[in-house]
Amino acid sequence: MHLLADPETWVAIAFVILMGLFAYLGVHRTVLKALDHRAERIRNELEEAKRLKQEAAKVLADYKARRASAEREAEEIVTSAKAEAERIAADAKAKMEDFVARRTKAAESKIALAEAQALADVRSAAADAAVQAAATVLSQSVKGSLGEDLVAKGIAEVGRKLN
């Protein structure tokens, strides 16, 4: 009887009775169902996480492809803008050189025209002075109608030859 006085024996007996009662009531099936349900939920969550990871990888790959495409497109835009700017600069330079050449040619022709006009004016003034001098000399040395006729003929001839 010494065994019945030991408290550990009564704890063991209570445990065995409790386990028997749990087995009779089917608690183990409920616990197994709960564990199975939890395992299924965890499996579903893992599958969902795997699916989301794959979807995120696809989105990331799509983003990287779009980014690379945008970078290439931006590079093409910059390249074409540089080429266009160089073309515009070359056109502007050519137009400016043409404008300067035309202005230089116009200025040179105006200068040549002014030189020709000045030369003609100098010749005309020299001719007029020569005619006046000749008229004065001849009128003083030759007197009468013969002198006047000679002076008139000489003036007319000099005027024809100089102009």
From Swiss-Prot:
CDD domains: ATP-synt_Fo_b (cd06503). Its main location: membrane. Keywords: ATP synthesis, Cell inner membrane, Cell membrane, CF(0), Hydrogen ion transport, Ion transport, Membrane, Transmembrane, Transmembrane helix, Transport. The chain crosses the membrane at residues 7-27. Disulfide bonds: none annotated. It is a single-pass membrane protein. It comes from the Bacteria. It is found in: Cell inner membrane. InterPro entries: AH/BAR_dom_sf, ATP_synth_b/b'su_bac/chlpt, ATP_synthase_B_chain. The keyword Magnesium does not apply. One of its GO terms (molecular function) is proton-transporting ATPase activity, rotational mechanism. One of its GO terms (cellular component) is proton-transporting ATP synthase complex. Coiled coil: none annotated. Belongs to the ATPase B chain family. F-type ATPases have 2 components, F(1) - the catalytic core - and F(0) - the membrane proton channel. F(1) has five subunits: alpha(3), beta(3), gamma(1), delta(1), epsilon(1). F(0) has three main subunits: a(1), b(2) and c(10-14). The alpha and beta chains form an alternating ring which encloses part of the gamma chain. F(1) is attached to F(0) by a central stalk formed by the gamma and epsilon chains, while a peripheral stalk is formed by the delta and b chains. F(1)F(0) ATP synthase produces ATP from ADP in the presence of a proton or sodium gradient. F-type ATPases consist of two structural domains, F(1) containing the extramembraneous catalytic core and F(0) containing the membrane proton channel, linked together by a central stalk and a peripheral stalk. During catalysis, ATP synthesis in the catalytic domain of F(1) is coupled via a rotary mechanism of the central stalk subunits to proton translocation. This is ATP synthase subunit b 1.
